[in-house]
Amino acid sequence: MPWDQLARQSILLQAVSVWRDDPENWLAGSFDRLPETVRVNPLRSDSEWTEGWLEGIGSERIGWFIGPGSAWTLPFNRGAAEGDIREMLADLHETGRLTRQEAVSMLPAIALDAQPGEVVLDMCASPGSKTTQISEHLGEAGAVFANEVVNSRVNMLVTNVQRHGSRTSVVVHHDGRYIPRVPESGFDRILVDVPCTGSGTTRKNPDVWGKWLPSGGRSLHDLQVALLSRAVALVKPGGRVVYATCSLDPVEDEAVVAEVLRNSEGVDMKSVMELLPDVPGEAGRTDWPSLDDGGGVTVVEIPESMQPPSEQGIASQLPRSMRVWNDKIGGGGFFLAVLEKSEDAPERPAPEVEVKMTAEEVKPDSDNSPRPIPDEVASVVESAWGALPDDLWLRGKRLLLSTPEVHDVWESERSRRGGRTRIPGGRWRPLKVIHLGLSAARLRRGDVERIVAGAAHELAPRLPNASSEVDGDLIDALLADEEMSPDEAGVNAVRGGHILIDRATRDCVSVWVGVRVSLMLGKAERRILSLKRGLSITEKEEE
């Protein structure tokens, strides 16, 4: 059946006919494929160049986007780029200079408004676009714990935070409903972008037309309530929780928020319309009917938590949430609610401590967990680089750059068994940490093998003995695959991993100095640098 016919016969359109007086307008704006939209990474020193490239191909800034960074609508549909533009877009994404992301999915991180130095939780994080956006808000200070419960999606999350190149990310693997309270003091801000039926995603996932049923939202409601409830429990007094779905169904949206407010003290909603004044949204609802799986209004009984709230104190707050309709924003449909915990919100009384474990009594973290760099490795690194960067971690054979706030969480005391057992810090347990920070270098046979290209711009100013300023012509020659000896490059006293800095443009490139000087750049980074510098693009790859 053609998609347009399927859409017109869909249960979803029947439901929207109940929720809106003008369902035909919604349908007209919910069918065409989405435009390609991207977010530019402001943590990269050449972000202005990336923005210039986007302008050059006819892209337009998204007017309602609030930085840091910028967001753009490209002049073609999602996935429809061709030729050199398609290749460069892939390169810019791969190297972390931009992130492909649906425009409406940028809204939650804007509403969260994380500040540098804060400790943030992204409770349902994969594939990671919102995590990387939070990292951009944090800059070089703070931590965002990116949690994912599904094994197969954890790898995708790690890949994306590594690609982005932020020092603040920490990837953890838990069921969000039971994620441990680490740090014990709680999080400054929490994003809860819950699993949902995706009724707002018809332009991205046309299969929704044939699959969506009202019973789907009811089946997810309890999970959504549990995830948001855990977030409210984990956020600090004075902290903020953002609840987000790509669903238009009030059972997954306002009903979830109302149930959490019903069971929480000292928590109130903040107006999303005021936080995002330029977004064409609609105030949340205080009333909605129950729907059967034909999309019609029904009198069948459903649990109280899925019904409109009878409490005036809760109902009066629901219009502070915001629903974004596909046709109003020219993209996907979305729902947002912002909850804030008051400074004097009652905290659950701490139970009496029954056991206080020593470091020796606690099961150690997995060998694969990141840990602060041990003394013996620190000596090797300092010998190789002439200095030891702060906040350096080790995971396997990989050196990672992080932040003081991540280390503070690792050092902090925590508890188990509801607080009855105290555990000393200096570990991640009971938190299961998979990856953190920016990959900086690799070890091989006990020595620092090389500096990872994506970390060169971070490490260069910290490592005067492991970096050299050179004329731009020299870097151009290396990009053009000209053979060069250490003497010709002016690094005759250097062996091993090194960073060359263009003294004019401040471009940083990772090299290996042996018998000759070799660029340690992947194809994507090599192509972008060549384009930036006006060179012909070569296909050689060293990394």
For each feature predicted by the language model, list its residue ranges.
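Conserved class I S-adenosyl-L-methionine
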Residues: 117-126
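Class I S-adenosyl-L-methionine
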Residues: 240, 248-399
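Helix-to-beta-strand junctions that scaffold the AdoMet/dcAdoMet cofactor pocket
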Residues: 139, 235-237
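Mobile active-site "lid"/loop adjacent to the S-adenosyl-L-methionine
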Residues: 152, 185-230, 236, 242, ...
